[in-house]
């Protein structure tokens, strides 16, 4: 199926991921319909402002692929109320699955945070026993719920911490925070230096979704999606080597999150190679800082 025969429904089109993904797929000549609530700003003039839960079955069934980005998308956003984040992340997700037919493909975003506090390199078979936060629980629920619909084409992506430029930037993400601090103040402050993080470059994420769109064989499956793994201190030291400046370790804000993910399954199933590095992500941010339209911190909802 050629691009012009595919119709993409992009839910959460104007957020951090959506802003970049829309531009990427538009450049590839995909037919895209955007839907977003503009919680963090309006990035695209053609976006429909609506809660995706209000979309009808008839409307949703017009599309060959649905990409679900709309969510309470961070631990912080979910911190005040399990009810609100559960309604958005889980209840709306279930109703969306019920609306799609077996010929459509749904791509949704899960998170590597579901692995919690684990320094070992883990793949998708690693047992998930429980989350460290409301956010984690909603993502674990989504992954379990998706598996209950084996006849539907549902692809879940357990994303590493995303790094890279977007017009709707997220400055609190690890590489984004380190890069902007290094560029603007010549100083980086980190906590939990020995904890691991899986980092996903924005360009790799866009490429991975493109690979799914182009695939003729879709498995109902969850994939780890990450470009590289390292300790937080190692990411900071690499950026210091690139751009110089002072590196300060502050251990006054400990966290239990430490995750280290193997993305081999996705690479095998989609004949894909992750290319992003700390260097490519840093360059992507540094050369596009002046293009940032919104840089709002993701706060509780």
Task: Show which residues each predicted segment covers.
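NAD(P)H-binding glycine-rich loop region in Rossmannoid oxidoreductase-like domains
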Residues: 52-88, 99
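Glycine-rich Rossmann NAD(P)(H)-binding loop
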Residues: 162-166, 189-199, 221-230, 252-256, ...
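Mid/C-terminal beta-alpha module of Rossmann-like enzyme folds, strongest
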Residues: 178, 208-211, 215-254
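Active-site loop of classical SDR/Rossmann-like NAD(P)-dependent oxidoreductases
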Residues: 42, 230-232, 250-270, 276-280
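Amphipathic terminal alpha-helices
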Residues: 277-301
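Conserved Rossmann-fold NAD(P)-dependent oxidoreductase catalytic core, especially the SDR/UDP-sugar
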Residues: 94-134
């Amino acid at each position: 199926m050629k691009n012009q025969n595919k119709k993409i429904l992009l839910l959460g089109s104007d957020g951090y991921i959506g802003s970049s993904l829309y531009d990427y797929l538009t450049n590839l000549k995909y037919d895209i319909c955007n839907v977003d609530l503009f919680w963090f700003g309006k990035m695209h003039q053609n976006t429909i402002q609506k809660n995706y839960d209000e979309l009808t079955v008839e409307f949703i069934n017009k599309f060959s692929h649905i990409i679900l980005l709309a969510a309470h998308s961070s631990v912080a956003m979910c911190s005040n109320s399990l009810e609100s984040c559960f309604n958005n992340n889980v209840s709306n997700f279930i109703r969306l699955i019920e609306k799609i037919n077996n010929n459509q493909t749904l791509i949704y975003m899960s998170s590597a945070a579901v692995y919690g506090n684990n320094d070992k390199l883990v793949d998708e078979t690693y047992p998930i026993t429980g989350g460290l936060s409301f956010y984690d629980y909603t993502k674990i629920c989504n992954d379990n719920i998706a598996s209950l619909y084996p006849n539907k084409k549902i692809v879940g992506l357990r994303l590493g911490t995303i790094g890279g430029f977007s017009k709707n930037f997220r400055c609190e993400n690890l590489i984004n925070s380190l890069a902007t601090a290094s560029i603007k103040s010549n100083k980086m402050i980190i906590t939990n230096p020995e904890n691991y993080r899986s980092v996903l470059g924005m360009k790799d994420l866009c490429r991975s979704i493109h690979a799914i769109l182009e695939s003729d064989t879709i498995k109902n499956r969850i994939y780890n999606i990450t470009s590289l793994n390292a300790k937080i201190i190692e990411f900071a030291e690499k950026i210091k080597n690139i751009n110089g400046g002072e590196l300060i370790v502050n251990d006054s804000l400990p966290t239990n999150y430490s995750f280290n993910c193997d993305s081999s399954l996705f690479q095998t199933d989609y004949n894909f190679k992750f290319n992003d590095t700390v260097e490519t992500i840093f360059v992507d941010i540094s050369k596009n800082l002046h293009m940032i339209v919104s840089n709002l911190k993701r706060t509780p909802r």
